A protein has these predicted regions:
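Glycine-rich phosphate/cofactor-binding loops in nucleotide/flavin-utilizing enzymes
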Residues: 50-69, 153-190
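C-terminal helix-coil-helix/basic helical segment that borders enzyme active sites and/or dimer interfaces
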Residues: 84, 88-94, 111-164
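Glycine-rich flavin
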Residues: 1-14, 149, 159, 177, ...
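Hydrophobic, well-ordered secondary-structure elements that form the walls
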Residues: 103, 138, 187
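Alpha-helix initiation and N-capping motif
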Residues: 49-50, 76, 96, 117, ...
Length: 190
């Protein structure tokens, strides 16, 4: 396996968007029909492409794991606000003991994961095999976060179309469906 850079405008290169269950198309199939690539586009040595690809995957996984955490901490979709909106609140607390407990547990894990990522960065910050573990945990954490928001939203958590649902509910449904792609990108969770 060798690693080549290929200009997407090269004759014979074409793409076809892959529509996900969220309705979005962030991924594409790429087709190479009789494409010729100059030798100068070889990255590294001939037959050493897998080593380069593994390093790229480590960086991608590191990005995804941090992105999953950042999505939870700085998101417009605050899990507590959504739960209060749909379940109600009493004395400033979510008005449902089960969800209050689940969300509290989730937020504690989110905080611990954030501290772990920070510590790993402080200790060197290099992409390594640790990035695979962080990517796996970050992916599962992000999926769980969205599952909690959807569940707490009740029927509004599966909003798609219609005037009876607001745009925030519709966007939450699509974001929840989008999290399924997190377990594939950057190397599958399997």
């Amino acid at each position: 396996i060798s690693f080549l850079l290929i200009d997407m405008a090269t004759k014979g290169v074409s793409t076809k968007p892959i529509t996900l269950i969220s309705g979005k198309s962030p991924f594409c199939e790429t087709f190479f029909d009789n494409v010729e690539v100059p030798k100068g586009n070889l990255i590294g040595e001939l037959n050493a492409g897998w080593t380069i690809a593994k390093k790229l995957l480590q960086h991608e996984r590191a990005f995804i794991s941090n992105f999953g955490l950042a999505a939870g901490m700085g998101s417009k979709r605050d899990i507590v606000s959504i739960a209060k909106k749909h379940l109600g609140e009493e004395n400033g607390k979510i008005n449902n003991g089960f969800y209050r407990s689940e969300i509290s547990s989730h937020k504690i894990k989110e905080h611990a994961f954030g501290l772990t990522l920070k510590r790993a960065g402080d200790e060197g910050g290099k992409a390594s095999a640790t990035a695979s573990m962080f990517k796996l945990y970050g992916t599962e954490h992000n999926k769980k976060r969205h599952e909690l928001m959807v569940a707490a939203s009740g029927i509004n958590g599966v909003a798609w179309d219609g005037d009876e649902f607001d745009d925030n509910d519709k966007n939450l449904t699509r974001a929840w469906l989008r999290t399924k792609g997190n377990s594939i990108e950057g190397g599958t969770s399997e």
